[in-house]
Amino acid sequence: MKISSFFSKFFIFFFIISLSNTNAEEWTIKSNEDLSFALVSGEITHGDSLAFFMRKSENCEKMWNTFSVYTYEKPKDINQLLSKDIPIKLNGKELTASVQDVRPFLMGYRVLFSLGHFPVKEYTYFLKEFYDEFQLYEIEIIDNKDFKASKYFDIKVNNWKLDNLVTSILEAYDKCNQLLLSKS
């Protein structure tokens, strides 16, 4: 009886911890000798990331916005997606994202998309306003007449929490500027 009570309490505790971690907004901010980045994990597929890169070679003034998608689908022609513009919806608005990389990963593939290259300050302000308006940042890979999303992606939608966007971008920006100061 005592053992089952212990396990019951343990599983309730573990469940509560799991729920709190599920709702956590996990940012990673790092740099190497050439760039810095801020990256947040997805809410639907945790391994999918939304990332913002700043390069020392651009004086840390431009930001490259990317997102990655893991797919279990393994069509033989998945590499033909490289450099193609794929239709997406960002909070319901139809856009395209450019495929930058396709790599085998675990039991499928990880596909890296670019949303573009933007001035850091203006784009950060735009994203904050955009996120505050909708309280959502959701990307869905969609079909068009030349592209069937389900052929390549088993999970076509993900979203990211961006409540800590500004502080995370500022931290990555500071790291990038430290790289500039350490120029030889």
Spell out what each predicted region is.
Residues 1-25:
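Classical Sec-dependent N-terminal signal peptides that target proteins to the secretory pathway
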Residues 23-184:
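A generic "folded-domain core" signal
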